[in-house]
Amino acid sequence: MKISVVYAAPRQPLLFDCRVAEGSSVAEAIEHSGVLRYCPDIDLSKQKVGVYGKFVKLDSPLKEGDRVEIYQRITRVLDEDDDDDD
């Protein structure tokens, strides 16, 4: 079945279209897509994944046409001043 894997890389979003076996999981699709070779900084033990904007687990099964999304980790940066705008 045909699926897509999308990663919002720091410099530019990456899109990988690939074919996987029926019943493949999110993790299998990510591995098969090749995105991990292009972006070795991806850490699936820390980053969340989703399908069409909804968080899913790595073992979730996919359907034809699904778009797997690997989300960037969000970090909060505190400024050093005394205001409450953090």
From Swiss-Prot:
InterPro entries: Mopterin_synth/thiamin_S_b, RnfH, RnfH_sf. Pfam families: Ub-RnfH. It comes from the Bacteria. Belongs to the UPF0125 (RnfH) family. HAMAP family: UPF0125_RnfH. This is Protein RnfH. It comes from Stutzerimonas stutzeri. The lineage of its organism: Bacteria, Pseudomonadati, Pseudomonadota, Gammaproteobacteria, Pseudomonadales. The gene is rnfH.
